[in-house]
């Protein structure tokens, strides 16, 4: 499996480079975030051996267990890794997230952000966070409406133990490629409007977490700086019951 994961990662990097060339982007400005949901520690280590340092987890407890196992098995490696929570976050899980994760992509409420800031240990650098934008207005998904983003951005950016870095979005996976790219472009434009506010003049938002295995190129065309790839890195995984 280690060879297959390495081959997959090399293929994804080639795809990123090809998409960037097509749309005039610098591939060094697009981070591969390997989504390691349901992947065992051995698979994570295979990805690390292939050069990946950033991992995305959907479930808090599963992610923390991997971090602790890696810290015990490979202490020299674990410190170089960045762990991103890309799944929903409930209030009763904020402390463990604040204590272990480096990034949270799914901020959509001031209350959650306040708890993360209060519970982030002062010996750790501020937790890097993204606002989740419900760009297509789906009632089936989390995230805030684009019209509410500036107010939430101002509130979150004032919290001392958080650093607001940008926006995350997941449009309807059933949308066609043209519509998907349009929706991602709306998220990029929204970040641009937020950055026009004087509050963000010194530290403008710089991160767009957009795109997965099925729509990576559309996201890159629209300005993604971070693509969340699971199946393309680790292969098809069993559905959790």
Feature locations, PLM:
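Conserved alpha/beta-domain cores
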Residues: 1-214, 220-222, 234-236
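Gly/Pro- and small hydrophobic-enriched strand-loop and loop-to-helix capping segments
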Residues: 224-241
């Amino acid at each position: 499996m280690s060879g297959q994961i390495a081959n997959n990662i090399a293929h994804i990097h080639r795809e990123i480079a090809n998409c960037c060339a097509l749309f005039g982007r610098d591939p060094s400005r697009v981070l591969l975030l390997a989504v390691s949901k349901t992947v065992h520690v051995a698979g994570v280590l295979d990805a690390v051996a292939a050069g990946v340092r950033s991992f995305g987890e959907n479930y808090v407890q599963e992610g923390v267990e991997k971090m602790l196992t890696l810290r015990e098995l490979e202490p020299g490696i674990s410190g170089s890794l960045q762990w991103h929570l890309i799944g929903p976050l409930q209030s009763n899980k904020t402390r463990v997230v604040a204590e272990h994760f480096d990034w949270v992509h799914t901020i959509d409420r001031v209350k959650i952000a306040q708890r993360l800031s209060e519970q982030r240990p002062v010996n750790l650098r501020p937790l890097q966070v993204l606002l989740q934008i419900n760009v297509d207005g789906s009632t089936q998904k989390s995230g805030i409406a684009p019209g509410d983003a500036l107010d939430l951005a101002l509130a979150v950016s004032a919290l001392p133990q958080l650093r607001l870095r940008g926006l995350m979005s997941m449009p309807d996976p059933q949308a066609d490629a043209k519509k998907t790219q349009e929706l991602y472009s709306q998220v990029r434009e929204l970040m641009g409007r937020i950055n026009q506010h004087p509050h963000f003049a010194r530290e403008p938002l710089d991160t767009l977490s957009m795109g997965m295995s099925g729509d990576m190129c559309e996201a890159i065309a629209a300005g993604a700086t971070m693509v969340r790839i699971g199946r393309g890195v680790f292969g098809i995984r069993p559905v959790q019951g």
